Amino acid sequence: MRIVEDEREEKLAKSVVLRSYWNQNDMLNLQEYLDKWSDIDLEDIRKRMQKSEFIEILSPNLKMVWNPEKLESNFTQEGDILWLKTPQSWVHWIMPDGFKLEQTHPSLLQLAVDLLLRPWHEEVKAPLDEGREKGVNYALSYSAGNDSSAAMQLMPEDTILGYHERNFNSNLNHDNAHRMINHLRKNREVLTVESNHEHLRRLRGKPTGFSTDYAASVHLVLLADFLDLRGIAFGTPIDNTWLAKGLNFRDFSKSKHLQFWRDRFAEAGLELIHPINMISEAGAMKICKESSFIDFMNSCMRGNGVKGCGKCWKCFHKNGPLGRQYDVKSREIYSFLKKRPLRSGMHAIWATKVMNIKHLLPDYESILDSDLGWWEQYYPPGLELIPSELREHVENKLKQYLKPMNTPYVMETINLYLE
């Protein structure tokens, strides 16, 4: 898009363009150019977009029918926008300059469709096309929160950080993430890709969110050839690896989940990496507390860009132990503390202990009265899950922050269903 060259009139021209998109209800272009032209002060439009509950499912200037036989054929590209035709709607991503659909291996497109539609469509489970060779770079599916920031600290410094940004209106607020990302960008690049793919669950009567455990990385899967990726890392802590939902121990190394998704990513020439599988959310906090970015990092997704909302579960168990404000009487926090099995399991128990409010969990008194120092240490067997090329680097970084758990491992005895 060409904007007038006269610097005195440039802001006025940009303002006219943005207000035109608003008046035409062209939310996709409006969001794209609001981001590109951050120097334009249109807070009224920005705030109205955030508060609106209306989700417009956009579509390209092309008529297509879902093809279940050739999944990669359901993609098309218009400028920087990559489109995917699904059986129910269109999904889009605003891709970086230079991305070209035709230069993307079919297996990556097929894997992306699988990650988005697996819960509802059997045809996406077919074998992927062969032939994609591994690249040389690593990427991290980055959320700007506690766990993925700890993963960032353990991965090599040249790891590509890829942030997925939901670009339709919901109760999620990106302000806290933006603050962290803007801070990081002073020293390294952070790639942000906007998409509406989280609406797919909503079409099926479920809360807005990710279709599968690894759908948060779809933007990086689609960009794997563009970025020459060897593997994609996730900030998944012990709470969701060696402990199932933070409640009971399992041998994650032999789990069907890990074996299946490792193989599935490998079909597309990608390594699936869990750099913090061996540490808890508490361990991740300890790593982040020793970083220069701790004052900019906030896991709350409803905050105002400076602090958390103080009323959500993330503010309780992620911000509370950092000494940040939370309201234990808020509806969400109060109800989750009463729910059984306990949400966030071991980490919630640890959090109540370090915040000196263990009276809120009287039925876990025996655990609360025990030594929970091991929860802030790392589980050595988890290092074996790190790809060999990365293992030494991750282990050396890890030892700078945390001590190993002692044997016999207390964690291997955890089963909160029995409490």
Model-derived regions: residue spans:
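Nucleotide-activated chemistry modules centered on ATP-dependent adenylation/adenylyltransferase
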Residues: 12-26, 32, 37, 46-72, ...
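ATP-binding N-lobe of GHMP and related small-molecule kinases
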Residues: 74-80, 94-96
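N-terminal cap/recognition module
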Residues: 91-117
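Metallo-beta-lactamase
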Residues: 143
